[in-house]
Amino acid sequence: MNNRQATTIWSAVLVEELIRQNASMFCISPGSRSTPLTAAVARNPRASWKMFPDERSAGFFALGHARATGRPAVLVCTSGTAVANYFPAVVEASADFVPMIVISADRPFDLQECGANQTIRQDGIFGRYARWHMQLPQPSTEIPLQSLLSTVEHAVAKSLGAPRGPVHLNQPFREPFDPEPLEGQDPWLEPLQAWKLDGRPRTSSAQPERRPDARAMATIRELLATARRPLLIAGSIPSPDDARAVASLADDLRIPLYADLSSGLRLTEGTLAWQQAFATPAFLGRFRPDLVVHFGGRLIARHPSAALKAWKPAHYVVIREHPERYAPDHPVSLSLESSLQTAAEGLMGCRSEPSAIKEPAEGFFLHCSGALDDLTEASIPLSEISAARQISQLITPGEALFTSNSMSVRELDSFAAALQPDGLPCGLNRGASGIDGIISTAAGYGEGLGRKVTLLIGDIAFLHDLNALSLLRSLSRPMRIVLLNNNGGGIFSFLPVASCNDIFEEHFATPQHFHAQHAAGMFGLRYAAPRTNREFEECFLAAGEAPQSTIIEIASSRSENVEQHRTLQARFNAFAETAFTDR
């Protein structure tokens, strides 16, 4: 057996075992050194794959796909800076516990650190952001293929273990790279005959059941039973089953539930928008929880953290599926590692008295909802707030949402209507909260879910991932992109630096003076630029029926958006004063 044949077989075995381990989505960027891997994927009929000219975009697509499926997508690239372009997506996957597998082709040992072209030190390139990394050997008949199968299984298990995250396999190849099949049999392959025939993974790993500690659960039940003003928080919760269990617990105990957009519960019919309450001083003066039970990850809005930091509740309990710490302001009195669903179900029935805050709160939320609906009246000008509100009203149950960071996610989290009978998947990159790779991540998220996705994104984030528009023509379902173009970084207008007139516009707002119409034409996408709420509704619904992806660009003003936020917040404050005075 020659080197080409050994490399061909090695790559085919590696790819086949990944597929058997249920890591069957491959995001490939073309390159010469990675030819054996690319050929192995292309020639495996059970592999799903997508080609990406840009590794950075590929990394974020894989991230979005894994967010949707809960399984790692596999990234394949050539040597050199190609693998470095995955770094932002790897950081996000690590920070937000998303499984991912990177396989980078590399030069062999004798070409390392000697001036060889397109060669960098790739082993361990992701440092602490990888859950595990392995420098694989150059394919050789001297190395048992069983060890390769075992390594693949371990890589998948490490990606899916607690805490989930990215894994890196660095694979050196020696020329020639083009595949050459083996004619006949070879002793090297004999130990794999049974594996080849049965179609199952050679080794399977069972993840441990994350059952909660009985003593900790007894403590939490007692705290919930005796608290006067308890509050449940649903932070980032990837699993719909977990999210539903937390919502059921809140209903059973009749206590308030703060549902973050990333929990999947924020848009569920009947969910109260506690984001509005926590941003309202008059409300906060009447509600000071003495117990917080926080399920899942971090929150989008800063107001809850600021309020809880000031209130210092007697007990702050965090329940998560992994051992990593979540305590940004260090308020936690009890941390429990457990399946969220199991923990929520185990806390059912521990309290009979409803929270005293519920009745006045419901009146407050009803008035807030009416004020927001006033902003969506058909004939008035479209705004960032009314666009976010209408998206939540118009999107259908079989679709999904994805949102960029900065102002986009805050508009949806704060002002969306809760109308979905069974909730709605809503993805966002909140691990490191960057604005890079958002279009790519949304595309992967929709493909992973098998749903049409609507993306809400700002103009700076849109420019950051502009080349990802080339992906949209090949998606299985067209995407809506709702672009909030306020000509700069809108969130800075809400920060103290906005008062520094001599430096603000050029150094923070950074206006780019562009419109997306020509970008849409360049990539063969539909384009619309509505000006009123009625026009937006028409464009949004038409995009849902169109065979191509659509960019709906909303030209807005940063200063007008700030003023609308302040006016709305003043109304919310008045509603809170009335709701509590009337009692």
Curated annotation (Swiss-Prot):
The keyword Manganese applies. Its EC number is 2.2.1.9. Keywords: Magnesium, Manganese, Menaquinone biosynthesis, Metal-binding, Thiamine pyrophosphate, Transferase. InterPro entries: DHS-like_NAD/FAD-binding_dom (IPR029035), MenaQ_synth_MenD (IPR004433), MenD_middle (IPR032264), THDP-binding (IPR029061), Thiamin_PyroP_enz_TPP-bd_dom (IPR012001). Pathway: Quinol/quinone metabolism; 1,4-dihydroxy-2-naphthoate biosynthesis; 1,4-dihydroxy-2-naphthoate from chorismate: step 2/7; Quinol/quinone metabolism; menaquinone biosynthesis. One of its GO terms (biological process) is menaquinone biosynthetic process. Its cofactor is Mg(2+); Mn(2+); thiamine diphosphate. HAMAP family: MenD. Catalyzes the thiamine diphosphate-dependent decarboxylation of 2-oxoglutarate and the subsequent addition of the resulting succinic semialdehyde-thiamine pyrophosphate anion to isochorismate to yield 2-succinyl-5-enolpyruvyl-6-hydroxy-3-cyclohexene-1-carboxylate (SEPHCHC). NCBIfam families: menD. PANTHER family: 2-SUCCINYL-5-ENOLPYRUVYL-6-HYDROXY-3-CYCLOHEXENE-1-CARBOXYLATE SYNTHASE, PROTEIN PHYLLO, CHLOROPLASTIC. Belongs to the TPP enzyme family. MenD subfamily. This is 2-succinyl-5-enolpyruvyl-6-hydroxy-3-cyclohexene-1-carboxylate synthase. It comes from Chlorobium luteolum (strain DSM 273 / BCRC 81028 / 2530).
